[in-house]
Amino acid sequence: MRSDTIKKGFDKAPHRSLLRATGLRDEDFDKPFIGIANSYIDIIPGHFFLHEYGEIVKAAIREAGGVPFVFNTIGVDDGIAMGHDGMLYSLPSREIIADSIETVMNAHKLDALICIPNCDKIVPGMIMGALRVNVPTVFVSGGPMAAGHKKDGTPIDLATAFEAVGEHAEGKITDEELYDIECNACPSGGSCSGMFTANSMNTLCEAMGIALPGNGTVLAMTPRRIEMVKAAAKRIVEMAKADDSKYNLKNVLNEKAVHNAFVVDMAMGGSSNTVLHMLAIAREAGVDFPIEKINEIADNVAHIAKISPSLTTVHMDDIDKAGGVNAVMKEISRRGGLLYLENPTVTGETLGERIADAKILNEEIIHRNENAYSQVGGLSILFGNLATEGAVVKTAGIELNMRQFKGTAICFNSQPEAITGIMKHKVKPGNVVVIRYEGPKGGPGMQEMLAPTALIQGMGLGDSVALITDGRFSGATKGASIGHVSPEAAEGGLIAFIEDGDEIELDTDKHLLRLNVSDDVIAARKANYKPYKNEVKSKWLKRYQLLVSNASNGAVLKTEL
């Protein structure tokens, strides 16, 4: 066992002495040492109860014959960090989480790992760190919260609350109606109830085979979720005791698993952030997965499940009751060749064996391929002179009339500037809002743009205004919102040289994003270019700015300058 490095031999007497201080006894030194990476934190609704999960996992590991060691990672709530400079820290937190997993696991030579994430950057951060360690690993997330309901019974969620701010600013709803939404949008603990970033990533854990079935859809703190937590703990001990490299994470999360994740992502219309995170995960897994490959997948996968924010009446609990992610994968597999069904999973089954008996229980929630919302996937990578290295759009959330769009640019050099401009009614129908210098380097930190996109929706401009940015979006964003524009403005990308009134063209079917301005005009602008720079005071963000790559590379940190 890997942990023999710290517990076997006469020369490890000091090490054992320290371990005995934590309560270990003679018999424990022959058992596998299991790391429990918890992400318990009080301020995040999806995490404040995870200390209870940690205790359940500890007890189950001991009962199964392992020795558990809990450690914690940090976490950022993107919703609470939204719309102010706190959002600068969201994406960088992914790197801290990955580094912390690697540090604790390798410093103490633990044999196996069970990760308890739930929200946004915590899931991919834990996956990235676990891949570096490459020991047997199981993920068991906290689970989604239930959808909320207004007093009149209308289902709502966090996206409703953000859009309500724009509606209130326009006088479309009263103070009382806004308060009703505020108090009921997030009714319980768990990751926010739609197919936002957290639930997208928790769902993809199932597709990659690194979590148990139901990980992305079974509600938080329910008896079924608790049983899943116990089962995951039991399984990690079985994997650790086997002491077989076939269970090491990179042998499960391989190139085929990355492909499977993107297939399910397309079928369910996941968050655009999944592109950023899956590209980063692929790099940590040693998988060469060029961004262009995503469109090849999208063009062949039907979009069969539409969930909030794309369809506001459907939430993760509805998907669970309709058969869950297994039912989605089973339906996808009816069109042969889309999923690698022979790929292993942490349960010991192949993916094909896992989904063999899955059934769609409600075809109004999970559609058949032939009755899909679209015969192409819910995400698209756009290319063109504005995005020579790619940009990302969630096609699942775009109205049909906005999938081909030409509009005139109105430019903002930061998210706060854009929010002010939108609130002051500077944005008109037919505009393309450009928010730049918000990329990984420019922000730095690549802020999410939920506040401006929600304002656009709430103010009734969602079917007549597009938005492009080198920043990114919340999974709760909908509309013609194109993010991750690469190269970013801070790298001298063309987005830096757009001026008010320029024509911008997008076509999601053709994967096109183009600035319709002549090369001569662009060359003249470049000759007189004075780059905009955000003032960065934080030492951590300055380090991040120096090391981060662009979005087309997953915004991972470079290991060499």
Swiss-Prot record:
Principal EC category: lyase
This protein's record includes keyword Magnesium: yes
The keyword Glycoprotein is annotated on this UniProt entry: no
GO MF annotation list: 2 iron, 2 sulfur cluster binding; dihydroxy-acid dehydratase activity; magnesium ion binding
Alphabetized InterPro entries for the sequence: Dihydro-acid_dehy_C, DihydroxyA_deHydtase, DiOHA_6PGluconate_deHydtase_CS, ILV_EDD_C, ILV_EDD_N, IlvD/EDD_N
One GO BP: isoleucine biosynthetic process
Cellular component annotations (GO), alphabetically ordered: cytosol
EC number, UniProt record: 4.2.1.9
PANTHER family: D-XYLONATE DEHYDRATASE, D-XYLONATE DEHYDRATASE YAGF-RELATED
Full protein name: Dihydroxy-acid dehydratase
Organism from which the protein derives: Sulfurimonas denitrificans (strain ATCC 33889 / DSM 1251)
Lineage start: Bacteria, Pseudomonadati, Campylobacterota, Epsilonproteobacteria, Campylobacterales
